Amino acid sequence: MVTTVADDMFTGDAISDPYSYYGKLRDEDPVHWNELYELWVVTGHDDLVWMTRHHELFSSEFWKRDQRSPYPAIDESDMGLYQFMREFFMDWFIQHDRPVHTDQRKVVHKWFNPNSMELWRPMVRSVIKDCLDEADASGHMDVMRDFATPLPLFVIAQMMGMPHYDRKFIRSMAEKLLFIGRGETDRMQPLTEAIKEFIEYLTPLVEEKAAKPVDENDLLSVLASGEKTGALTRDEVVADAILLLLAGHETTINLICNGTLAFTQHPEQWKILKEGRLEEPDAITRATEECLRYDPPVKSIQRVASVDAELGGKLIREGDRIRWFISSANRDPKKHDNPDTFDISRWPNTHVAFGSGIHHCLGATLARLEGQEAFKALAERYDNIKVETNEFEYQPSITFRSLKTLPVSLT
């Protein structure tokens, strides 16, 4: 079937309203060959989950296996920067398949188990209190700048033993790294600048941690221990430290910001949350899961076909690029009743905001904890959160669903 949807995923309409764009694809051509960018676009829930469960067919080693030019095209003069970026991303543990991925993930996997994460809940609450106390002084805040960003940034920096005065630097570098999912022709410039500055910043810290006995309370120390066991090289330790710093706060930023916006647009759901009228699991747990489903922090993930494989009646050739869209799968009517409705009573909530299979998000428990505490605090403090704009501008990324600002008044 030939779809009637335009193939440019980077248009303003597709960025601002991915649910209409990819929803139409899902309805018309759920495994769609995008002719413009020469890749498969997968939009259905069951197809996405099937792919994650068949990792032997669809490789995570995208940067290693894919030798073609980037999409959209970049400035020809920046191809050297593109190769530098590719080689760097190859060192991330999420860019490996089994057994390498399993061995490398094991280095820090235990650190993120639910019991370990619970130990951080008091600190999360303390940071939230500080943020909201400051907002109370004026009765206004930019949710993105004043709440959603400082909370998870503080937490991951503390977990990794980063000096508090370096948080601003970490965030500025993370913002440059996020150009990876954007379409500007000159995007390699800020992206590679951030990689180089991050490497320069983290290398001496990793050297310091590696020279000492492992400190189980320090995530960077635990990560550095992977070099001693042979699971990681020094370059991989540094690269994974950058990954953890980035992924350790960006997903939660978008969860909190997108979720807050959803509640302002659905006052009846805000009332249910405040009144706690839901049975087990409680309203906060249900609300956080529905925020993750309704407007997920990550829109899409890319893979490359390891072998010829059939999906949705289409033949995917070895080496083909594939991009699956979480944002569409989470609104699939074949999986969710009334999928375009924000309903915090929805349970069970079988969204795929954190992926599925062996590459399920390592930090999912942490993101959930931070989201739960953020929404709980907002509901306990405020009767009304009113958005002070009618225009919502999103970062032009097909990877992340990220608002630029969210100004609100608080009463």
Which sequence ranges carry the predicted segments?
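Cytochrome P450
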Residues: 1-411
